[in-house]
Amino acid sequence: MSDKAVLSCRNLGKSYEEGPESVVVLSGLQLELHPGERVAIVGSSGSGKSTLLNLLGGLDTPSEGSVWLAGEELSALGEKARGLLRNRALGFVYQFHHLLPEFTALENVCMPLLIGRTPIPEARKRSTALLERVGLGHRLAHKPSELSGGERQRVAIARALINQPGLVMLDEPTGNLDHHTAQGIQDLMRELSTSSRTAFLIVTHDMSLARQMDRVLRLEDGRLVEA
C-alpha cells in the first residue's frame, strides 16, 4: 500500500433544515488519513462526531465539500458502486454493533467476504481465525442475543476487519468492553497499523484510548482542531 491518503475530505459540511432555519452541524472540515495512521476524534456529546463518521463512510451525504475513499470521490459514484467500495476498502464499527440478529457470530463475520464472492469454506476459515484472535473462538455458533454486549462488540470489530480494508472507522469501539478486552482491541489495532498498514479513525469519549493514537483531533463548533 502506498502512502497516498486512504481517506480525505475537503471543505466538508453538513447542515439540516429546521423550519425556516438552517442548523449547521459541521463546516469546512479538512482531514487526511494515510496508511497505518491511527487518529482519534474526541468531542462533547452532540458535537457531530457520529455525523462526521457517517459522512466520511459514505453513509450520509454532505451539504458541501467532498470525501475521497481509497482514491475515489464518493459523490461521483452511484449507490451500488459506493456500496462495493465500502465493502472492499472500509470497515465500520458502529456504537451499537448492528449485527444481524438471525445469524451466528461466525455468519455475521463471514458476511462481507460472501458479499465479495469469497468461497464459503475460505470465508468460514478466515472468519473463525479472526474470531479466535479477538477471544471468541468458543462463541462461533452463538447468535447476538446469546452474547454479552462486549462479545457483540468484538464480533462487530472482527466483521469490520475481515476484508483487510485499508481503513477502519470505529464509533466508541471500547464503550461496552472491560479494561482487559479493550486493551486487547487496542493492541490489535496497533499491530494491524504496523503489519498491514491499516488506518484507523476512532470516535471516542475515552481519552485513555485517544492518547494511544498517533493524532487526536477535537470536534468543536462544527470544526476539527488539533487536541
From Swiss-Prot:
Per the UniProt record, which EC number(s) apply here?
Answer: 7.6.2.-
**CDD domains under this entry?**
ABC_MJ0796_LolCDE_FtsE
| UniProt topology in membrane | Peripheral membrane protein
Entry keyword annotation includes Acyltransferase: no
Entry's Gene Ontology BP terms: lipoprotein localization to outer membrane; protein localization to outer membrane
The text of the family note is: Belongs to the ABC transporter superfamily. Lipoprotein translocase (TC 3.A.1.125) family.
Q: What is this protein called?
A: Lipoprotein-releasing system ATP-binding protein LolD
